[in-house]
């Protein structure tokens, strides 16, 4: 499970308005969806947070996916006439059943792992 948080998203709403923030969320969601594989499931948790469920992920495949996901923010996103290049991602990763016994533990572990801005980290107990 990947827990994805948008860094500096509030700044988009504050500077350009909530319509721009909504448009940015849609664009980022589409980029994340395109970067994932067919069996993966992307969900918006709320606000500026997403989860990506990657069935059968290993530590190696999760790290490779995290690199791919971090890459979605390499190019600026154009909203109306504004180019937004300062929003980034923080990603926490937790593997089931290695790092959690149930869905709540898995989400908690991934959330705990994502606490470093601009990084993708695998949960370590």
Language model features: what each stretch is:
Residues 34-39, 71-83:
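Short catalytic/binding micro-motifs of nucleotide second-messenger systems
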Residues 74, 102-125:
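Catalytic/regulatory signature loops of cyclic-dinucleotide turnover enzymes
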Residues 53-62, 80-84, 89-106:
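Catalytic strand-loop-helix junctions within cyclic-nucleotide turnover domains
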Residues 41-44, 85:
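A short pre-motif secondary-structure segment
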Residues 7-34, 43-47, 51-55, 59-67, ...:
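Conserved long alpha-helical elements within nucleotide-processing catalytic cores of c-di-GMP signaling
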Residues 4:
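Cofactor-binding loops of NAD(P)H-dependent oxidoreductases
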Residues 32, 39, 72, 98, ...:
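Nucleotide-sugar donor-binding/catalytic module of glycosyltransferases
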């Amino acid at each position: 499970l990947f827990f994805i948080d948008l860094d500096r998203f509030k700044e988009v709403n504050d500077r350009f308005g909530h319509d721009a923030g909504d448009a940015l969320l849609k664009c980022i969601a589409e980029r994340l969806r395109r970067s994932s594989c067919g069996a993966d499931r992307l969900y918006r948790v709320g606000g500026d947070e997403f989860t990506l469920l990657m069935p059968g992920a290993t530590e190696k495949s999760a790290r490779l996916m995290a690199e791919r996901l971090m890459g979605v923010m390499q190019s600026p996103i154009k909203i109306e006439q504004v180019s937004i290049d300062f929003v980034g991602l923080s990603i926490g990763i937790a593997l089931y059943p290695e790092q959690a016994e149930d869905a709540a533990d898995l989400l908690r572990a991934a959330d705990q792992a994502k606490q470093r801005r601009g990084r993708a980290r695998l949960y370590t107990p």
